[in-house]
Every structure is written in C-alpha cells, then in structure tokens.
UniProtKB/Swiss-Prot annotation:
It is an enzyme of class 6 (ligase). It is found in: Cytoplasm. This is UDP-N-acetylmuramate--L-alanine ligase. GO terms for biological process: cell division; cell wall organization; peptidoglycan biosynthetic process; regulation of cell shape. The gene is murC. Its main location: cytoplasm.
C-alpha cells in the first residue's frame, strides 16, 4: 500500500531568507527557483535577457533583473550559479567580496532533497523523459511529488512543481559532475556515453568511476536502478556496493520488456517482473529508447508500492516533454500534410534513437530532417558517428554548429559534415548558412505524408513554431495544447 500525502518537510536553511540565482532563466535553474518560491523563500535572479521562463517566475513573486550587475545581489543571503557562470561575473565577484555564499545549482537541489525521499535520475541520455515519467506515474498513484526536470512537462506546463508528499524527483546532471552533490534514496542510471568529456579530462574511465561514486552516495538501504542493456552500465554494475535493480530487454534484467509493438506515437509492450504477473502497458511515445525509460519508471514505481493500475494509467496518459519528439502540428503541402516534430537530441546516439523511432512508427513515410549540431567540441569528438547516423535521413538540411560559447574548431563544422555525408553516397545534404530563412528552403523539399524533424539543442528550438506560423504554410494546424498534471 502506497503511503499517501505525508506532509513534506521544509528545508532547514538557517539564516537564509533571500536566494539570488545568476542565470535564473536556465533550464536547470528556473525549476529550483520555482520550488523555493513556493516554499516561501524570497527569490531574485538575473539573466542576459527576459523570457517566458523569467516572466513566469516574476508572476510567482521573483524579482528579475535583465543583465548581470553587482547591485543585483543587494540583500541576498546566498547566490546560486550554474556551471556556465564563473568568478568574473560581477554578481559572483561581489558576493565573494562580501562573503556571501556562492553555491552551484546542484548543491541547492541537494539541500531540497536532504529532508525528502529523493529519486535522482542520471545518465547521458533519457534523464528528462525518465524523470517526467516517474513524476507522472507517482501522480497517477495518488502521490503528489515535488519534481525538478530539465524540460517542460507538458501535462504540468512547467519543469518544476512543489508537491505535498515526501517524494522529490529530479535529474542528476553528470555534465559537470555536479550530481555528486546529491544524496538520494533511489538513483537511476539510464546509460553512460562519451559526452561532456572535458569535465573528465577526456578520460572515459574517470567518467565511469564518477558514476560509481554517485551511486555510492546512496545510503546502504538505498536502491540503484540500472539499465543492464547499456554495455558501460553493465560493466560498472559489479562495482556498485548498493542494492540494485536492473531493467532492459535482456533476459537477465529484473524488469524486462517483451512483445514491443509500435503504431505511430503509441508503443505497446509487456513487462515481466520477478514474482509478479506480466503487465501490459502502452506509452504515448515512439521508440525502444522510450520503452527503456518506461521500464526504469516501472521499476521504481513497483519498488515504492505504486499499484499496477496507476502505473498503466500514468504511462498511457503521459503527455510528453517539451522538445522530446514533440509533435507541433501539421504543415499543408500539395496533396496533403506533413507532420512537424521538434526534438532536443544532440548526440549521435540520441539522433539514431529518434530516427529508429520514426522508422518503427511510420515505416512508409520519408524523414526530412533539419539538424543543428551543438558545440564544436562535440562535433569534433563524435564526427564519424554524426556522419553515420545523419546519413540515415531521406532528406537532410544541416544548419551551422550552435557554438554554445565555444570557439570554432577547424574541420568540426557543418560544411565538412555535409561533405563527409555526401561522400558516403546515400544522400546529398543541404548546408544552411547562418541567418538564412528556412521556410522557403524547406517547403519545396516536402511531400504529402513526410515527417519533418527539427532537431538539436541550440536555437533550432525556435524553428518548429516559426514554420507553423510562416505565411508559406498558411492553414497549418497546431497540435493540441497540454493539460494539467493531476
């Protein structure tokens, strides 16, 4: 029987009244700020420009500053910063001079988690979707979890929500190794891949050891939920000296999926659990990678005593996450329509998973892909992998690399990617120079029934809504808006 609606303990941050966020509009920062606002703390924050996110926080009572200035820190008891902010920032420099504590966002998240039943989701890919699925299933089970997610949960219309139960569900970010601040009771590792390697001095073994260290932050009575299908997770499994529960397609998994069938956006499968009856479920997301994300959720929900009925309901009613295979609507073309999809994937493994999902759900449709590589360093380090997976589209348009603050690296750009893909002989990609309007380029390439995928972690996120509103696609139909998480 699930323990329901236990009063959530408040963080005991003595002497802390006003909390200032440097870069409050960031996806990892705004959620924590929103939870703290709802807990009754005074919250202020600065960012280089205003956004819908900062407007939302302002409507909840946050004081928002546009631009970083020393005077923004007046009255702050602590500064919260992301890994992108350094000591040259005038607000950080002023705080250090005045002996105001400056803490990374993960340390503040750890403080919120300290007095709760923390569930932390780690892994190179799938963190946001898995965290969102867990929150949705717990909500369906009558629990009211607090969650902090790295994407917008469509059913809630936000990436964070303060609940009344003891559960706090959050992403654990390995990109800067800040997940080592967290001390959850349950931890998920979805997979381990070569990404953000600068943090680990280019040493993959160091990355693996850091994941083991993260899992050893669990208490001896905690639980590590691990995807046994991932070869690196399988490699570190014997090193984890905590209780473990494995999931995957493998016959050796504790929680296993069989009979997977995909029909468009819907994926159906049967779950096998030790000493339990088989459970038939469906999830409103395509692809085997989302079956794995669902299995992690089922493993945790089962262990926490959530009923099978709530698990089935939470998965089938899941409305997705912003920019994770998000269907924006339909674009009219001669003879019919094109399905417009936006996706955040920016690693070859993520790109491959999405392409496989399209092929599985819509096997007779062409995939027209607009892709924007993210970071020159990632493009350089994974160049051959990008060439291989991007060549699997039917039509490919490559935007220039989104730098994310990096300087260009010779050879690690979209022109060279186009050249290398063209040499494979599978398709002839189109290079898109920065600043070129995309709608006139894309429209002549589309046919009725196509799937148009806009993918990447940079400013390509604004392309799908732009196409939907373009006069060249007059009569475009937007997808239904989200509901509320209950």
């Amino acid at each position: 029987m699930v323990e329901n609606q236990r009063a959530m303990p408040q963080p005991e941050m003595r002497r802390i009244r006003r909390i200032h966020f440097v870069g409050i509009g960031g996806v990892g920062m705004c959620g924590i700020a929103e939870v703290l606002l709802n807990l009754g703390y005074e919250v202020s924050g600065s960012d280089l420009k205003g956004s819908a996110v900062t407007e939302r926080l302002e409507s909840f009572g946050a004081q928002i500053f546009v631009g970083h200035r020393a005077e923004n820190t007046v009255g702050a008891d602590v500064l919260v910063v992301s890994s992108a902010v350094n000591t040259s920032n005038p607000e950080v420099a002023t705080a250090l001079e005045r002996r105001i504590p400056v803490v990374p966002r993960a340390e503040m998240l750890a403080e919120l988690m300290r007095y709760r039943h923390g569930i932390a989701v780690a892994g190179t890919h799938g963190k946001t979707t898995t965290t969102s699925l867990i929150a949705s299933v717990f909500a369906a089970g009558g629990l009211d979890p607090t969650f902090v997610i790295g994407g917008r949960l469509n059913a809630a219309g936000t990436n964070a929500q303060l609940g009344t139960s003891r559960y706090l569900i959050a992403e654990a970010d390995e990109s800067d190794a800040s997940f080592l601040h967290l001390q959850p009771l349950v931890a998920v590792v979805t997979n381990i891949d070569a990404d953000h390697m600068a943090t680990y001095e280019g040493d993959f073994n160091k990355l693996k050891k850091t994941f083991v260290e993260f899992l050893h932050n669990l208490p001896f009575y905690g639980l590590a939920v691990m995807c046994i299908d991932d070869p690196v997770v399988r490699e570190i499994l014997p090193l984890v000296k905590r209780p473990t529960l494995t999931y995957g397609f493998s016959e050796s998994a504790d929680i296993r999926a069989i009979n997977v069938r995909q029909d468009g956006m819907l994926t159906f499968f049967t779950v096998l659990r030790r000493d339990r009856e088989p459970l038939d479920v469906s999830v409103n997301m395509p692809g085997n990678h989302n079956v794995l994300n669902s299995l992690a959720t089922i493993a945790i929900a089962t262990d926490e005593g959530v009923s099978d009925e709530a698990i089935v309901q939470g998965l089938s009613g899941f409305q997705g996450v912003g920019r994770r295979f998000q269907v924006y609507g339909e674009l009219p073309v001669e003879g019919g329509n094109v399905m417009l999809v936006d996706d955040y994937g920016h690693h070859p493994r993520e790109v491959s998973a999405v392409i496989s999902a399209v092929r599985g759900g819509w096997p007779d449709r062409r995939l027209v892909m607009v892709y924007q590589p993210h970071r020159f360093s990632r493009t350089r380090d994974l160049y051959d992998d990008f060439v291989q997976v991007l060549a699997d589209a039917n039509v490919l348009l490559l935007m220039e690399v989104y730098p994310a603050g990096e300087e260009p690296i010779p050879g690690a750009d979209s022109r060279n990617l186009c050249h290398s893909i063209r040499q494979r002989g599978q398709l002839d990609p189109i290079y898109i120079e920065r600043g070129v309007e995309l709608a006139p380029l894309v429209k002549p390439l589309l046919r009725a029934g196509d799937i148009l995928l806009c993918q990447g972690a940079g400013d390509i996120g604004g392309l799908a809504p732009q196409l939907l509103k373009s006069p060249l696609f007059a009569g475009a139909k937007a997808a239904p808006t989200e509901g509320k998480l209950k």
